[in-house]
Design a protein with these regions (language model features):
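Charged alpha-helical initiation segments
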Residues: 1-40
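Short, solvent-exposed segments of well-ordered alpha helices
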Residues: 2, 6, 33-41, 113-120, ...
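Generic structural signal for well-ordered, non-transmembrane alpha-helical segments
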Residues: 6, 13-16, 20, 44, ...
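Charge-rich, solvent-exposed alpha-helical interaction surfaces
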Residues: 11, 18-21, 73, 93, ...
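Charged/polar positions within long, soluble alpha-helices
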Residues: 20, 24, 54-62, 106, ...
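Amphipathic, Lys/Arg-enriched alpha-helical patches that create a basic surface
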Residues: 116, 120-128, 139-163
Length: 163
């Protein structure tokens, strides 16, 4: 199911294009560590886009009742409690809207399913970079592209649940 939100869709297309360009560039480089650094950068970028996209979907849902005070409260609560998205944090925020929303999400994405494993990998890579630095990068652009393609259904499902 394609993403209906134009802003999110455009960001996902940008990432896909960036991955294509990076793979072409990396193929011309003699030092594989350059590709690993680039892959790690793209991984962190993907996580940022995921955070922003998921928050945007929650904000859009928060404004549906047309009550700015309620929406502002919800948006601040989401911003405060939601970064480095994980299965449980997404489920908890969905549950605040409606327990059925989190149940639908948890039913679709079991703890060890491919999509959640990809999301966890993206988070782990970013955390390792932030806390251990770039001294031991072994990430490939193909790995990042694989993770990216596997997390898109998470955004699609959140958009579907909140619609």
């Amino acid at each position: 199911m394609p993403i209906r939100n134009a802003e999110i869709s455009a960001k996902l297309v940008d990432i896909a294009d960036l991955l294509k360009d990076a793979k072409v560039w990396a193929a011309t480089q003699p030092d594989p560590s350059l590709a690993a650094h680039l892959a790690t950068y793209i991984d962190v970028y993907i996580l940022g886009v995921l955070e922003e996209s998921i928050e945007l979907l929650f904000r859009e849902r928060a404004y549906l009742p047309k009550d700015d005070c309620v929406a502002n409260y919800i948006c601040k609560d989401i911003k405060r409690s939601f970064s480095n998205p994980k299965r449980t944090s997404i489920g908890e925020v969905l549950k605040k809207f409606n327990p059925d929303f989190s149940n639908a999400f948890y039913t679709k994405f079991a703890p060890n399913c491919s999509e959640i494993e990809a999301l966890d990998s993206i988070n782990t890579i970013k955390q390792n970079l932030a806390h251990m630095g770039a001294y031991d990068l072994k990430l490939s652009l193909q790995d990042v592209e694989d993770y990216f393609n596997r997390v898109i259904p998470i955004i699609e499902e959140i958009e579907s649940i909140l619609s």
